[in-house]
Amino acid sequence: MIDTILPIPDLFAATRVLCIQPHYDDNDIAAAGTIARLTAQGCEVIYVTVTNDLMGVVDGFATDDEARIALKRDQFAAASHIGITQQHWLDYPDAGAYDYFAVRRDILMHIRRIKPDFVMTCDPWLTYEGHRDHIQTGLAVSEAVMFAGLTRIASSDPTVDAAYQSHHIAGIAFYFTREPNVIVDITSTWPQKVAALRSYHAQFDDAGLDELVTAFDHKSRQVAQGQAFARGEPLKVLHTSALHCGI
């Protein structure tokens, strides 16, 4: 593999990070430890959730409205443990049919409106990723990051486009990746991550939450092997110019 010639941007130099996830728990499952560190140092971290996440709700008797309430309840509970105070939802159908370019337009709108200096999402190029929501979200975010300054490419809100003045996005961080170039030390924020994960009751029963925490207990230790800390989260962090033509 030929590495990019561009430097790896410093995620922890960011002051505003936009984390865009396919489902309501992906940011926290993958990167709650990292995010808790960011918010602890004063970084503003904002969440956007692409799908309505209704397909994974474990209560088979819940109506869609009841499921939506439960999902939001979980998200706000998890957010309280890691310092998230602002969330937005795009409400595309979970594991369903929706237009990729509509998603990209919505994400582009939020990038232009919020003006983050760093963006985080799932790696759409993860080997063997079988969930299209993850692939489409990661790719749409990558394109939106590249196209944010090209105002001839419309977002979903013309008023946002008209008011937008180009800003600098220092980098993009991909989680759920098998090609990390940064391992973040989450030893100090591991308890916050566990508390966030244990907030997700709508899609996990108690046994499922135990399995989830156990899996990421092992994973956090595995990725920290050879590092000077006990627990880590793997990220692929790229300069935005590395997203096109293999620079």
Regions found by a protein language model. Give the residues of each.
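Active-site rim/loop-helix segments in enzyme catalytic domains that contact anionic ligands
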Residues: 1-114
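Metal-dependent de-N-acetylase/amidase catalytic core
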Residues: 1-20, 97-247
